[in-house]
């Protein structure tokens, strides 16, 4: 992980621990009047990030977090999802396409439609994990994979 792979942002002091993964939800009404909002809001809404390092123990006041916020380094977190088995090749670079399935009752629906990944994202398959053929209610041949975006 290089310095250019991380961003400095602020996170609630109760949440600030290395390894924490979160989905950045974006600006809240309370943020409009904050002098630190540019640092807080420099992430892409709807994306998954991981806290890599706590930069300082200095707590900054926040209108949203009652215990204040801390400066942290974050990186894009890898995301678990599914791909067609024939496309699941470790190290391959792909353009992400979500599964074409609307079976919300399926046990793997949440994995097939992960939060934080968007159609058309350029990703690298970091790891091919397991076959999900027997779990897919639509009968698709799927593999669970870890993607870096």
From Swiss-Prot:
This is UPF0179 protein MA_3685. The lineage of its organism: Archaea, Methanobacteriati, Methanobacteriota, Stenosarchaea group, Methanomicrobia. Belongs to the UPF0179 family.
């Amino acid at each position: 992980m290089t310095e250019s792979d991380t961003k400095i942002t602020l996170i609630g002091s109760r949440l600030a621990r290395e390894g924490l993964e979160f989905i950045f939800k974006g600006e809240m009404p309370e943020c409009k009047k904050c002098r630190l909002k540019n640092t807080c809001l420099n992430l892409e809404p709807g994306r998954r990030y991981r806290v890599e390092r706590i930069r300082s123990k200095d707590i900054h006041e926040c209108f949203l977090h009652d215990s204040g916020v801390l400066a942290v380094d974050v990186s894009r977190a890898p995301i678990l999802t599914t791909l067609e088995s024939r496309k699941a090749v470790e190290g391959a670079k792909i353009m992400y396409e979500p599964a074409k399935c609307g079976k919300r009752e399926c046990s793997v629906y949440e994995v097939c439609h992960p939060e934080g990944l968007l159609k058309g994202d350029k990703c690298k398959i970091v790891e091919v994990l397991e076959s999900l053929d027997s779990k897919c209610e639509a009968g698709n041949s799927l593999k669970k994979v870890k993607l870096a975006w």
